[in-house]
Amino acid sequence: MVSISPQLRRHLRAGKHDIKALKLSARCTYLSSERDTLDGLNIHFAGIDEYHAHPTDGVANVLRSGMQARRNPLHLTITTAGFNRESPCYEMQKTCKEILDGVKHDDEQFALKYELHEDDDWTDSSTWIKANP
């Protein structure tokens, strides 16, 4: 994406393993899913994709601890539901539901959930946009 956009190329350099914002001395890179290799991070933003596939919350905890020195860190988790009710993602989903239902208040967490309504027919393709905008 960076290599084909003149606007992005002016500000960013894309390498094999990362993207660097030269004037900011910042970079974006992917990390291992092995939590033992992530200690010592000093990060401002962490994004976890498909959290339902994480067997433990080890990686998420290491990423959060790597943000403690930052004034306004941002931790973003994106996932589909998954099926494992023993996973940390299931616990997070329960918390998010409580926030969305007004049962729980948490100024540090923003929850957004896309899903069909209970009375929607999942076989009706016109309803799918609700769960996959």
Residue ranges and their predicted role:
Residues 45-47, 76:
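Structural motif
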Residues 15, 57-133:
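Non-catalytic, compositionally simple segments
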Residues 49-53:
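Walker B catalytic acidic pair
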Residues 1-44:
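Inter-Walker segment of RecA-like/P-loop motor cores
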Residues 36, 54, 84:
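Glycine-rich nucleotide phosphate-binding loop and flanking beta-alpha elements
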Residues 6-8, 20-28, 54-57, 114-126:
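Phosphate-binding glycine-rich loops and adjacent basic patches that engage nucleotide phosphates
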